[in-house]
């Protein structure tokens, strides 16, 4: 009866399979347990023999600590229930709780956490979850740390993006709230952003994924938390403009700033939707040239080649400063073969085309910002003489456009004055337009450039002779974010006596009634034929000593101190 009962349990469609074989299975050489031929290790847990090491992708890191540059502890945690590429943020902190006892009040510190997954936030606000969620538990046991990526200003200048995008990226990169881009996993990065209701911590996740299909071309996908996820694949080409968010450009800049990352993400850098020019990844090699033995031939052929190079550089002149263009021209002749006429070639190649020597508006504005930095010195009083610049009308038009940023219409001057100049050159009747800026953020927005951001405060140290010297505080350097943050977290920085100067704009003290303005004056057509006008910048700055406002004290050594010289002696020669 037993064989018949077994036969009845076999389904009808499996009745003609025949005798069972050992195809697809094999014995473990150690314990004899049958395992599948594709198995990596023995399924007998007490045995644990490893057959081969698979090349499978390592599982995504559960929790990674983000570098914030402060006491804020933020973690990027994987959401297990959604997939390996879905991550959330968890914030850990310490809260103080008082407990009343018979002996008195005891203050204890309790570790607290906040998970920013919508479901966990909703459950926490409603008081449904008594214990910590799984994301907070993963963050508490986290031992991994994110890798900060370097951002180079030269790469940012070479990006084909709007000036507002570059400016925002630079402002985020120079803020002391951690590096701009941090790598969490192979494809996922964390980027700083402006704090909002959706991203209250000021961070968001981005992912770069490339899928290679057998029948189709490689598919490159970029997703940012600031965008809504669209599952329709046919609209991928139409959504390229949407994908070009500021966080996408920040990641691309970080990739291009590192040679290893540039090779790893070369498909995204070379992709048309990246918005980058070919100068992003510079080629260090030089073109092979035939050696020239006479200076006459170098005077004809290299001139033509130089014109071609300069014309090629003109296409990027709106993004690259002239010094980088000239440096690229100089680099092209580094690896030439050494011949007898190399000295003659260098002498003939030093001629410059005057028509190609230009100064961009951002380079000039960077010089204005540097001038303001030099003026804000602790050794002098906070009321310097006005800074005077003679610039073309087009430069002031660009500056006035920056003054009007944030308003729908062009901002009108606070006052317009007509005056007659009789006692100084040039003589005549002129008009003076004056703008009063009373918001320090607007002043920074007007004067900030990628190469020279405006420093609202400047730190100094006092020398033994009473003079003051500029102190470079070890803050976040955009060119070496990884080294800087590693040093800050490992060892606290020893700082001397804090002596600072600060730009006085607006109300800088509680009892101040009228705000201190940052004044911009413009007198057009000082040189009417050349269309050159006169720009005057007036401002004040204050002094801080250990965080408190200090009155200016002139402690400079007097210049009329008598010098003590040794008496002269007479030397006789035989």
From Swiss-Prot:
- On the tree of life, the source organism's domain of life is Eukaryota
Instruction: Please name one Pfam family that this protein belongs to.
Output: zf-tcix
From the Swiss-Prot or TrEMBL record, give the protein name: Uncharacterized protein C2orf42 homolog
**Annotated segments matching region Disordered:** 288-331
Organism classification, top ranks? Answer: Eukaryota, Metazoa, Chordata, Craniata, Vertebrata
Compositionally biased intervals (Polar residues):
312-330
Question: Which GO terms of the cellular component aspect does the record hold?
Answer: nucleoplasm; nucleus
Give the InterPro entries listed for this entry. Answer: C2orf42 (IPR026049), Zf-tcix (IPR029269)
């Amino acid at each position: 009866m037993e064989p018949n009962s077994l036969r009845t349990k076999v389904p009808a469609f499996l009745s003609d399979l025949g005798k069972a074989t050992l195809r697809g299975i094999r014995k473990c050489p150690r314990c004899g347990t049958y395992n599948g031929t594709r198995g990596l290790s023995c399924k007998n847990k007490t045995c644990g023999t490893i057959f081969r090491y698979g090349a499978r992708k390592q599982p995504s890191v559960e929790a990674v600590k983000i570098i914030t540059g402060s006491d804020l502890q933020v973690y990027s945690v994987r959401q297990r229930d959604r997939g390996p590429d879905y991550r959330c943020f968890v914030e850990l902190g310490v809260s103080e709780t008082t407990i009343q006892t018979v002996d008195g009040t005891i203050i204890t510190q309790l570790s607290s956490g906040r998970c920013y997954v919508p479901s966990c936030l909703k459950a926490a606000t409603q008081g449904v979850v008594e214990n910590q969620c799984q994301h907070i538990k993963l963050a508490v046991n986290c031992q991994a740390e994110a890798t900060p990526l370097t951002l180079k200003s030269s790469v940012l200048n070479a990006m084909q993006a709007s000036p507002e995008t570059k400016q925002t990226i630079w402002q985020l990169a120079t803020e002391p709230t951690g590096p701009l881009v941090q790598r969490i996993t192979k494809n996922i990065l964390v980027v700083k952003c402006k704090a909002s209701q959706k991203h209250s911590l000021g961070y968001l996740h981005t992912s770069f994924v490339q899928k290679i299909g057998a029948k189709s071309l490689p598919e490159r996908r970029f997703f940012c938390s600031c965008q809504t996820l669209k599952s329709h694949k046919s609209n991928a080409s139409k959504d390229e403009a949407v994908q070009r968010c500021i966080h996408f450009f920040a990641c691309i800049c970080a990739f291009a700033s590192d040679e290893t990352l540039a090779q790893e993400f070369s498909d995204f850098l070379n992709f048309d939707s990246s918005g980058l020019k070919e100068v992003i990844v510079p080629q260090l090699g030089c073109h092979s040239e035939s050696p020239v033995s006479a200076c006459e031939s170098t005077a004809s052929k290299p001139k033509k080649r130089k014109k071609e190079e300069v014309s090629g550089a003109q296409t990027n002149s709106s993004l690259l400063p002239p010094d980088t263009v000239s440096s690229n021209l100089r680099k092209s002749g580094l690896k030439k073969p050494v011949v007898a006429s190399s000295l003659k070639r260098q002498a003939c190649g030093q001629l410059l085309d005057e028509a190609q020597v230009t100064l961009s508006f951002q380079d000039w504005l960077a010089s204005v910002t540097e001038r303001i930095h030099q003026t804000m010195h602790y050794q002098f009083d906070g009321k310097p003489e006005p800074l005077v610049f003679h610039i073309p009308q087009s430069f002031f038009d660009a500056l006035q456009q920056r003054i009007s940023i944030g308003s729908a219409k062009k901002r009108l001057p606070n006052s317009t004055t007509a005056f007659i100049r009789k006692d100084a050159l040039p003589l005549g009747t002129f008009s003076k337009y004056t703008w009063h800026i009373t918001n320090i953020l607007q002043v920074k927005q007007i004067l900030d450039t990628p190469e020279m951001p405006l420093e609202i405060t400047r730190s100094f140290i006092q020398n033994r002779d009473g003079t003051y010297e500029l102190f470079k505080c070890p803050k976040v350097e955009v060119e070496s974010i990884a080294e800087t943050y590693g040093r800050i977290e490992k060892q606290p920085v020893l700082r001397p006596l804090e002596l600072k100067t600060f730009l006085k704009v607006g109300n800088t003290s509680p009892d101040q009634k009228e705000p201190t303005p940052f004044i911009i004056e413009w007198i057009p057509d000082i040189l009417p034929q050349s269309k050159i006008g006169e720009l005057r910048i007036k401002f004040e700055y204050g002094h801080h000593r250990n965080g408190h406002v200090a009155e200016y004290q002139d402690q400079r050594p007097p210049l009329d101190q008598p010098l003590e010289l040794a008496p002269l002696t007479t030397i006789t020669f035989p």
